[in-house]
């Protein structure tokens, strides 16, 4: 009883930190049902590989464990590459690129079968969907940084900046249109195609050397590295045109609003603020903080992006409003204030402070979120409740995208 009283008398900020969702949000979360549609170009042939791979996954392995393992592999392999190429202008040993290619392929494979494992073990839940998308938000950042290093985009800082943040923007838009329409839509060119393309970039860098991307194409007089950038840009335009077609044509809420009854444009404030802050700090830096430490800079803002994306997913699943105020902006805010006061503290030191603050804030929020939902739904995050045979799981329509459905 004393313990309960102590918990009840805890400061409001502490309760908000340990329990991010309100009682009303938790109730609406119980009613949430995963809804997705669309099949990308590479999904049909890869389904054969994913189905084969699933046979080797033991029934006792929880879907969230598969997701986390894939993320860990992707993060670790990318960090190895970053350690050799902190400015994305260096050339790393060939094996680091192969390691990143393998790490990304493993991540893609495990990310594709976690939903299949959930249905196989009858453990589909809102927690699994949230965990999957939350890990994807962070993986997006590491994929962008790793691929940019492989193509030596650090020699063109503006390209490095553009490719990294546009990658985050596309991921955010995918969930933005989900918040508006209530359904996650996959296009013909989607995340699977991008991941396979990045694996190819890593392999080419391994066998041709990262400097191969600096080769000038005769007649065209452009660097070879611009070709993957243009291909990526084409995919971005294709995907974003589809996303904004859904967003601008109104949502499923009252009077064409979002699933939470808010403006369909409101989520744009969050990603817009991240990008504007990143551009301002980059361009106003007296010490060229981005040019000298691009990977650290992108990772810091990537943590901010990951948390905001996680909150957007939560807003969709709980049909609630997405608020702009967030402690995760403290990190970029420190850099902004340091520039305002003429770099009173060394900008590199402040960048590291911002990285620590943003990463801890993101991890603490996501951990508290998963723990609160697991307690409310009486689920274990990394254990399956039962081992149900595959034939007992309902087969969904082939028109629905099932890869990431937990």
UniProtKB/Swiss-Prot annotation:
Record: residues binding Mg(2+) 2: 111, 132, 136
Positions of Mg(2+) 1 binding: 111, 114, 132
Enzyme Commission number, as recorded: 2.7.8.2
Residue intervals on the Lumenal side: 84-93, 151-160, 208-222, 282-293, 340-346
GO MF terms, alphabetically ordered: diacylglycerol binding; diacylglycerol cholinephosphotransferase activity; metal ion binding
Cytoplasmic face of the membrane: 2-62, 119-125, 180-190, 249-265, 317-329, 377-406
Superkingdom field: Eukaryota
Pathway: Phospholipid metabolism; phosphatidylcholine biosynthesis; phosphatidylcholine from phosphocholine: step 2/2
Topology class, membrane: Multi-pass membrane protein
Positions annotated to bind CDP-choline: 64, 119
Cellular compartments annotated: Golgi apparatus membrane
Keyword Acetylation carried by entry: yes
Gene Ontology BP, a term: platelet activating factor biosynthetic process
Active-site residue list: 133 (proton acceptor)
CC cofactor: Mg(2+); Mn(2+)
Class of enzymatic activity (EC top level): transferase
Subcellular location, principal: Golgi
Catalysis performed (reactions): CDP-choline + a 1,2-diacyl-sn-glycerol = a 1,2-diacyl-sn-glycero-3-phosphocholine + CMP + H(+); 1-octadecanoyl-2-(5Z,8Z,11Z,14Z-eicosatetraenoyl)-sn-glycerol + CDP-choline = 1-octadecanoyl-2-(5Z,8Z,11Z,14Z-eicosatetraenoyl)-sn-glycero-3-phosphocholine + CMP + H(+); 1-hexadecanoyl-2-(9Z-octadecenoyl)-sn-glycerol + CDP-choline = 1-hexadecanoyl-2-(9Z-octadecenoyl)-sn-glycero-3-phosphocholine + CMP + H(+); 1-hexadecanoyl-2-(4Z,7Z,10Z,13Z,16Z,19Z-docosahexaenoyl)-sn-glycerol + CDP-choline = 1-hexadecanoyl-2-(4Z,7Z,10Z,13Z,16Z,19Z-docosahexaenoyl)-sn-glycero-3-phosphocholine + CMP + H(+)
GO CC annotation terms, alphabetical: endoplasmic reticulum membrane; Golgi apparatus; Golgi membrane; intracellular membrane-bounded organelle; membrane
Modified sites of kind N-acetylalanine: 2
Family classification: Belongs to the CDP-alcohol phosphatidyltransferase class-I family.
Record-given protein name: Cholinephosphotransferase 1
Lineage of producing organism: Eukaryota, Metazoa, Chordata, Craniata, Vertebrata
């Amino acid at each position: 009883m004393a313990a309960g009283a102590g918990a009840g008398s805890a400061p409001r900020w502490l309760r908000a930190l340990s329990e991010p969702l309100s009682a009303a949000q938790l109730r609406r979360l119980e009613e949430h049902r995963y809804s997705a549609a669309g099949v990308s170009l590479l999904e049909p042939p890869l389904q054969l590989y994913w189905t084969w791979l699933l046979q080797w996954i033991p029934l006792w392995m929880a879907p969230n464990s598969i997701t986390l393992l894939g993320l860990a592999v992707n993060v670790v392999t990318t960090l190895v590459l970053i350690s050799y190429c902190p400015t994305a202008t260096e050339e790393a040993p060939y094996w680091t690129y192969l390691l990143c290619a393998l790490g990304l392929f493993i991540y893609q494979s495990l990310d594709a079968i976690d939903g299949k494992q959930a249905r196989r073990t009858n453990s589909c839940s809102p927690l699994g969907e949230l965990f999957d998308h939350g890990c994807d938000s962070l993986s997006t950042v590491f994929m962008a940084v790793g691929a940019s290093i492989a193509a030596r985009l650090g020699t063109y800082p503006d390209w490095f900046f553009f490719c990294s943040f546009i990658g985050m923007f596309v991921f955010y838009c995918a969930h933005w249109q989900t918040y508006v329409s209530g359904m996650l839509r996959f296009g013909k060119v989607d995340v699977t195609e991008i991941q396979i393309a990045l694996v190819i970039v890593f392999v080419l860098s391994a066998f041709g050397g990262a400097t191969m991307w600096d080769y000038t194409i005769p007649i065209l007089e452009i660097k070879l590295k611009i070709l993957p950038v243009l291909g990526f840009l084409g995919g971005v335009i294709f995907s974003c045109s589809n996303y904004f077609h859904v967003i601008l044509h109104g949502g499923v809420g009252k009077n064409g609003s979002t699933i939470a009854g808010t403006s369909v444009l409101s989520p744009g404030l969050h990603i817009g603020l991240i990008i504007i802050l990143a551009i301002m700090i980059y361009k106003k830096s007296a010490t060229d903080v981005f040019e000298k430490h691009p990977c650290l800079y992108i990772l810091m803002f990537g943590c901010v992006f990951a948390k905001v994306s996680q909150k957007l997913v939560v807003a969709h699943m709980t049909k609630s409003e997405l608020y702009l105020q967030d402690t995760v902006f403290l990190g970029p805010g420190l850099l902004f204030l340091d520039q305002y006061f003429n770099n009173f503290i060394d900008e590199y030191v402040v960048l590291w402070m911002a990285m620590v603050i943003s990463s801890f804030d993101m991890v603490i929020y996501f951990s508290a979120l998963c723990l609160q939902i697991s307690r409310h739904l009486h689920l274990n995050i990394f254990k399956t409740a039962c081992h149900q045979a595959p034939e007992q799981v309902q087969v969904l329509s082939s028109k629905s995208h099932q890869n990431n459905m937990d």
